[in-house]
Each structure stands twice: as C-alpha cells, then as structure tokens.
C-alpha cells in the first residue's frame, strides 16, 4: 500500500519548485510580465520586423534580400514554384489543357482560335503560346500555321495532323502524340492582375464561354500550371485550416469539458495556451519570421498542444488539491512547486530540441527553429502566469467544482492493474520495449524523402485532374533542362553540336524523361542531310527567340529540355542520379564545359531532399539534446537513458507504420514527428519528475512508481485522449498533407501513451535501482483510489 508522508512533516520541494510556488504570493509579478509581453507582441502585429531592423542597423544580423514577386495575391509564395525556371520552351505561368477528338477539323480549329482570341483579350493576359504559333521549320522561314485556315478539306487537316506530330516544337511540347490533347501556355501581365480570380476562374470561364459557342465541337478544359497550382493549394489550405481548426478545437473543448466535468475549468485550462500562441505570433513578427511556411500551421499547433498538455497536468494537480480540502491558493502553491518544475523541464527540452533546427542549411528550417524556441518559452510563461492569476481570483472557487470526479480519474484503478502486471514482470516488459525499438528502427531506415505536386492539392480538384492528364498524355507538366555552359572561346559550333547530341542521347535513354528537345532535333527537322555538326549554320534561319532558348553562342550556353511527370522524388531519384553522373562524364571530356540539371523537380530532388534530411537530423539531434537535459535536470544518467525508449519507440513505430503503408518521408511527416516528440517528452518528464519527488519524500521505489502514476496518470491520459480526438477530426480532409499529419499524430501519440503507462514504469523499476533491491516485488494490495487526494493533503499540512 502507498506510504503517505507524515501529516505533520513538511514536504521536500526543490529550490526551483519553491521559487515557482512564490508566484502565487506575488500575482502582480504575473501581471507585469504579461503586460510587457503583450506590449511587445502588439508591436510585432503593428510593425512587423522592427526588432530585426534594429539588429541589422546594429550589425548583429544580416539583411535578407527578398526576390521580387508578381504583384497581387497570385504572386505570394511563388519562390519555390519558380525555382530553376528559365526561358525554355513549354513553360508558362498557367497551362490550359484542352482535350478533344476534333482538334484537326475545320470546326475544331475555329473553336480553338476563338478560345485563344478571347483569352488574349483579357487585360491580365500578356500572351498565349499554342500549336498554331509554332515556328515554321523550313529553309525560307515562311509562316506556316499548323492548323489550316479557311475552307480546308478533311484531307488537309489529316496532313496537318501528321506534320504536327513530327514537329519537334509541337509534339510533346504543345500537343500529345495522339493529337487529342493540346496545351495553351498563358503568360500573365502582372501589372493588371488585382485578384487571384484574374489568373484562374476568370481565365477558365472565358475559355469555356468561347467553347460554348461551338456546341458541335466536344471540348474538355482544365487549368493548371505554376500559378493555378499555387493558388489552388493556398485556397485549399486556408479553407481546411479554418474548417478543421474550428472542428478540432470544438471537439477538444467539448471533450475536455466532459472529462473535467466543467466548462469553466476547461476555459481556464485553455486560456494559457491560447494567450501563449497569440503572444508568440506577435513576437515572431518583431523579428520578421511570420512569413515562414512552417509557421502558418505547424507552429500554432505545436504551441497549443504543448501548452495545453502542461495546462492539463497543472490543472489536474490543482483540482486534486482542492478535492483534498486545500484552498485555491494552497492548491496552486503545491501545483507550481511540483508540476511547475516538470513544465519548466518540458519547456527547456522542447526549446533545445527546436533550437537544433537552427543548424539546418535552409533559411525556412532555421527560422522555424527559432520561432519554436520563442514560442515554447512564451507559452510556458503563459501557463505559469495565467493559472496562478486565475486561482487567486473568483475563478479559484469555480475550479473546485467537479474536482475528484474526473471521468479518467475513476478509471485509474483499472489501468493500475495493467501497470502492476508489467511491474511484476519488469525485465520481460523492458526487453520487449527495447526489442520493439530496435526492430522498428531498422524498418524505419527504409524511409526515403519524397515530394509530389499532387500531395498539396485536394483529391479530384480541377488542377489535380489536369496534372494527371498531362502526365498521361504529354509526359508531365514540369519542363526541366540540362544546361550546358562553356568558358573556352575555342569551342566551335560543331563541338557544341557534339556535346548537345551526347546530352540528348543520355536524356532520351531514360524512359521517365519525356520528349527531349534540343538544337539537334530542330536541325534534323529542317530539309537537308548530313551530320548535325555540319549543319549548325541552319540555326540562323530560325526565329532568334527560339534559337536563343536552346542555343545562345553569345552567352556561351545551350540546353536540352525534357518533361518530367509528377511521380515523386523517390521514383525519379535513380533517374536523376544516373543522368547527373553521365552528364558529369561528358563535361569531364570537354575542359571548360559545365553541364547541370535545372527545373523544379530537380530542385525537389536536391534541395528538398536536404530540407527533409535537415529536419530528420534535427529530430535525432533533438533526441540527444533532450537526453542530455534530462540527465542534468534529474542528476541521473540512468533516468536520462531510461527516457530514450518511451520517447523514441513511438517515433520509430510511426516510421515503421509509414513504411508498411507506403507513406513517404516528407516535410509534413517530419514536422508531425517533431511535434509528437515534444508532446511525448512532456508526459515522460511529468512522470519522472513526480517519481523523483515521491522518492524524495522517503517512499519505497515501487510505491513511488505507482504513486507517480496516481498523481500524473490522469493528466497523461486526458491530454492524449483530447489530442487524439482533435487530430482525428482532420482525417476527413481532402488534402493529403493534412490527413498524413493527422494520422501520424494519432498513431504516435497513442503509442506514446502506451509506452509511458506500461513501458516507462517497468524500465524505471529495472534500471533505476540499487543492485540489492529486488525486481518485480509489489505491495500485496493496490493503492486505494483515494490515495492521491490523501497524499495531496499530506504535502501541505504541517
């Protein structure tokens, strides 16, 4: 049975615990600190970046050069979309995909020309490139439209179709090989773009309106491209964020009220993380960190979950004291002295873990790490300041309602029996946990970084359907290139032709790279015979813009373009690796020549791979740093090592689940695992902190383990149930990233709770003991349900 301390003895609090407990006696200090942070946060909302500008003026920070972006809503956040883009054939701000079996008919040609005319009449459109504007490939340079004009016969259209599928600038660039799908490349005049509808809905509606005037021509149209894809993602993200945040927070509020048996208690508990998030979003604006893509969703979720977990642990302890007959001030004094220390440790460990992101090579990841450090510290201050203020006001009387009658608290004796089962077999339980960690870790090594455009789009959306259609008909939306540059003036045009031919041969040998285009194909399409190196002079017959897009002798550059499907980095990585290696071999045979790959898929292959690996390495670094902090905080290497298993097993199990279900390792999944690590560490620290406190009161080790669960078990279970329900609400989203984030949260947090309830006590029983102590020996009778309230009273009576 649990051994309670003498009612006339004073509990042993740590110096840090006694310091935190004094906050109850000085509520004015909480008000002053809260007011100062509020003023700073408000200044960030009012004048974003003012603190960063001061640091730059003082020489303590480097100014960041922001690239110019198109004006208006459509231009926000296009930096990543436009990476690696150059003036290459097949690229446009938007791509109108048109599918019809009647393209090469008189009625079809008239309908297409009217569609183009209507689109070009829009102020927001600077021009449209489509197959009828393909440059002529004849030695005289005479204009020769692909689609016949006037009263052309069906036989002329058949000849036109055969010529089109042989035209290197048409097939695979503007027209599918079967002649049923064409693309119109739309360029926008950003000076006249005032609303996102100007480059999406209005454009598509105009095209469909023109097509409706030709009912005899079957036409299907979709709009895709860099700008529509970005706007579709932004629209879906904003809609899903608002909808599912409201649903998730509503479920959390309702479930918390049910578990706490009182809405007022939930409002007090939720006030601290809400205030912490508001403070944080203002403070990061002071340093110009608000535009980070991770800070829009990931940061508020991380802070609200970690802050809510700490608030629940604090509130459960305070209400347990109230149920034992303590006054609100005494109960809060006790909670700050015990749970407050654990909350401080969780803040330190989470902040250090997030600070490891600052070692990454990419600005977005580094800035996200510093935002997290600011956020977790600010949220902890909110928890430590708001709850004491509430306890010394009228809210303190309300908190006692329903105390001791929480829904979870009544189930603790049943869960205790499961914990006792593992404590009677601690060696077996520990061996199983360590074995599972090793096995899941080995499986997790099979994860590979991946990224696809389609993952950011709602399933079945027009942009996503157009993307799939282009993959099947034209070999993909993205146009990449092998860029050839040289510094040696002695490199002659025939030499360039040989290099281009070698590069195109490498590209054409890869089945996943579609429709390569270079000066070699253009020359082969022109009349005449002979090797390409002997016919380079024919390039002067081509329109200068076309020639310069593939070969610019003044700039000493040439390129071979090709299309890439949206199959993901995992599928394309072997292809890109082979091509890159062979291009290096070609460059090595020609001194002064460099050959490199460019394009958005190439950026995802290289840079995004490094972003994900940065996050993954930071996750591992965070685990090591958290271990070091726990060793210092608990002054015990054994407890620090013990904490590795229950904290890393959920992550390893979630990663193994990703392998078995075919999920990729992307930015969303790594961020989800990082957040879950922070929450899992919180529960572990609360348990170990309480265990150390009970040991300091002179309680036997096995009794201290069981008493620690009686004290913090309610908070651990309650926070996990609430957060899992909140995450589960997002599983119905039509966005793949949101569903993946939510599912990882559900899986990881559920496993983390099981590890903290059943693995952690067994690990402590086996490894944190003297050699002379027996293992697996429990008291003959379980602790009574009222043990925790009795213990709460004994801690303050003297």
Model regions and ranges:
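Hydrophobic transmembrane alpha-helices and their membrane-interface caps
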Residues: 265-314, 639-688, 728, 755
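Extracytoplasmic
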Residues: 87, 154-262, 498-501, 540-623
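Hydrophobic, glycine/alanine-rich multi-pass transmembrane helices and their short helix-loop junctions
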Residues: 255, 344-387, 391, 627-630, ...
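Juxtamembrane segments of multi-pass membrane proteins
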Residues: 66-84, 417-544
